[in-house]
């Protein structure tokens, strides 16, 4: 077959290709390109690296854990956690020097709050000017003298033994509000003086603060000491020697403030926390205090050491109280969910059996006898107040009350007024609920625009109707009074 004849265009194209090839050959372009290409490939081969991933370790398969409660597994809960979180628990502050003041305008000094195994001078632990400490000592001695002269028995106005009415006459005046100490208040007491209004509080930092409500000079009437290095859990004022006062703390110390000696004497020291203290009205030489896991000790002031120790509860005792008409009858409340009534004449070291026990679903923060001793009121974290009546306190009435204060507010503790008619307890709406024992319900709430925080701990003046002190977790104290 004859070859196909090329067109003019194809012949011209082939001639151009041939001519270009000759030009490139004369310039040695192809050899140069080949050399460069070979060099580049060689360089890439030398520098190219590969990241080798390490072999992954084969993890063993973790078993799937199904969380089940102790109750569903039939296991008894730990006694330390059975009552929930510890009431008023707070970490002990560092035992180093720290500056604490009761008000922004008050000059303060640094106080060493370390544990002193011995007496402490009031002057050394005073938070403020030394001249103010001297003034407080003089004030306290005058308060004590007034208490001894008045006798301190019964209510003013001949109201003793009668039902006290007129709660609507109670009011909170603007001048009866003060920030006494910094931080949360755990304990509050009104001095049993008929001629002077004095309130003492203890806070979580180990401060003991005094408020002279009737102070009229340039001072604010507030005096703060730091005899302890941990939360002050209890205060007992001697009824006929108000210049003497016991305080206890979570660090296991009990101190006796003696204003005449101007000292905080060390009455007792132990390894366990002390949660509450109390004293019988007819025995000023003995002090009852709860320590550690349900232990109740009796401190003898004549020997300066404990004389008896009883294991009454499974875990901490939150309150101790005596029947005013029969001081052999004692009531205790505990985080184990019970409140018990004891006859001290029948309690022995190896066998402590309660006369009566009332059970709650959660921790019981308080159990107090009424002024006549015929009713026992308990306050529990299970949102209830129980009233025990009858010859053997066998009749139990339950009143619902919201007692959930949360972590930052001290637990509510219902206290008695000046007769058996009412129980006073704080609420979460910045008021004070009044519980009627006759109607078994809240019949009134004390409110005031002066209340800026939740009052949670209370005490009443034993001889003045209508005088109620309420303390907050911010260091404030409110003092209600009656116009009648």
For each feature predicted by the language model, list its residue ranges:
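Canonical WD40 repeat/beta-propeller blade segments in eukaryotic WD-repeat proteins
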Residues: 183-190, 230-237, 272-280, 315-322, ...
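Beta-strand-rich domains and repeat architectures in extracellular enzymes and scaffolds
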Residues: 177-206
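Loop/turn segments within WD40 beta-propeller blades
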Residues: 189-196, 236-242, 248, 278-284, ...
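Loop/turn-rich, solvent-exposed surfaces of beta-rich toroidal or solenoidal domains
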Residues: 370-375, 379-387, 394, 402-437
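C-terminal interaction modules of eukaryotic adaptor/scaffold proteins
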Residues: 432-484
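Conserved strand-to-loop turn within each blade of WD40 beta-propeller repeats
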Residues: 202-205, 248-251, 290-293, 333-336, ...
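Per-blade loop-tip surfaces of WD-repeat and WD-like beta-propellers in eukaryotic adaptors/scaffolds
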Residues: 169-171, 207-223, 240-242, 249-276, ...
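Intrinsically disordered terminal extensions that flank WD40 beta-propeller domains
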Residues: 2-185, 484
């Amino acid at each position: 077959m004859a070859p196909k004849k090329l067109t003019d265009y194809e012949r011209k194209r082939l001639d151009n290709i041939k001519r270009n090839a000759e030009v490139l050959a004369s310039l040695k372009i192809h050899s140069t390109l080949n050399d460069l290409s070979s060099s580049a490939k060689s360089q890439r081969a030398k520098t190219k690296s590969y990241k080798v991933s390490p072999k992954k370790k084969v993890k063993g398969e973790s078993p799937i854990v199904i969380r089940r409660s102790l109750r569903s597994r039939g296991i008894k809960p730990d006694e330390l956690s059975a009552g929930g979180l510890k009431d008023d628990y707070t970490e002990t502050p560092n035992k180093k020097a720290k500056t604490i003041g009761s008000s922004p305008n008050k000059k303060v000094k640094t106080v060493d709050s370390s544990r002193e195994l011995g007496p402490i001078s009031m002057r050394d632990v005073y938070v403020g000017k030394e001249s103010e400490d001297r003034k407080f000592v003089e004030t306290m001695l005058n308060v004590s003298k007034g208490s001894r002269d008045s006798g301190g028995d019964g209510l003013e106005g001949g109201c003793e033994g009668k039902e006290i009415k007129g709660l609507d006459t109670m009011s909170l005046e603007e001048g009866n509000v003060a920030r006494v100490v910094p931080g949360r208040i755990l304990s509050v007491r009104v001095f049993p003086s008929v001629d002077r209004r004095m309130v003492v509080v203890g806070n979580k930092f180990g401060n003991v603060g005094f408020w002279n409500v009737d102070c009229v000079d340039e001072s604010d009437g507030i005096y703060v000491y730091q005899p302890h290095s941990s939360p002050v859990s209890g205060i007992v004022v001697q009824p006929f020697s108000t210049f003497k006062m016991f305080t206890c703390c979570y660090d296991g110390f009990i101190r006796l403030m003696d204003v005449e000696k101007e000292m905080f004497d060390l009455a007792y020291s132990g390894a366990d926390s002390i949660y509450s203290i109390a004293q019988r009205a007819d025995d000023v030489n003995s002090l009852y205090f709860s320590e550690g896991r349900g232990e109740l000790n009796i401190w003898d002031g004549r020997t300066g050491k404990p004389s008896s120790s009883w294991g009454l509860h499974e875990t901490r005792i939150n309150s101790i109280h005596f029947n005013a008409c029969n001081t052999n009858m004692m009531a205790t409340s505990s985080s184990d969910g019970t409140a018990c009534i004891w006859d001290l004449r029948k309690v022995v070291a190896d066998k402590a059996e309660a006369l009566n026990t009332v059970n709650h679903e959660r921790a019981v923060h308080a159990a107090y006898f009424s002024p006549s001793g015929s009713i026992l009121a308990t306050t529990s974290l299970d949102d209830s107040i129980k009233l025990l009546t009858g010859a053997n306190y066998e009749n139990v009435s339950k009143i619902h009350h919201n007692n959930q204060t949360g972590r930052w507010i001290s637990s509510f503790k219902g206290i008695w007024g000046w007769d058996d008619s009412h129980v006073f307890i704080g609420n979460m709406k910045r008021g004070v609920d009044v519980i009627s024992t006759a109607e078994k319900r809240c019949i009134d709430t004390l409110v005031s625009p002066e209340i800026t925080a939740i009052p949670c701990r209370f005490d009443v003046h034993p001889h003045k109707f209508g005088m109620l002190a309420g303390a907050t977790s911010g260091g404030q104290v409110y003092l209600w009074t009656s116009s009648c």
